[in-house]
């Protein structure tokens, strides 16, 4: 048995945005592969998507911009990072449009309130049918199709920004990187 004492020192850089992207992707895959709980998996995917873009622009801003304001709104941060490298922000067109929608979705849930929605309609037929329940805007947004589109657009936006800033590592596929030194103590 080796009783030597070893000291390990170094630095680990954890790419939070990469974890959030993986979480959004995993939740979407779960929604696609199983009807059971798919609404909740879509919800998680879209929320993680919104968290991811904010984490990514924080990553870029803190690394590349000297006067970064981490307390600005996520969309203001996105605009600032994009402007620095000549990327046009058009919230009326994909893929940027999806960043706005996902952020609005996230805000609806993060600052959620109990909603009261009016119900009034007439229908012919059997009275045993289920009542058509009205849905909030965030509930209407929470679909597999939307979650998939937002994730595709998120990836496109991040890759575009990443390429323009010429980072040394890929935007995706790496969750963390670092270096370590192991020293055997005598």
Predicted regions: what they are:
Residues 7-15, 32-47, 93-96, 100, ...:
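Short, solvent-exposed segments of well-ordered alpha helices
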Residues 22, 43-80:
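Short, contiguous, well-structured surface segments enriched in hydrophobic/aromatic residues
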Residues 83-92:
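Acidic/His metal-coordination segments adjacent to aromatic residues that form catalytic metal sites
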Residues 24, 45, 49-56, 102, ...:
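Amphipathic alpha-helices that form helix-helix packing interfaces
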Residues 29-36, 61, 65, 114:
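Short, flexible helix-adjacent loops and helix caps
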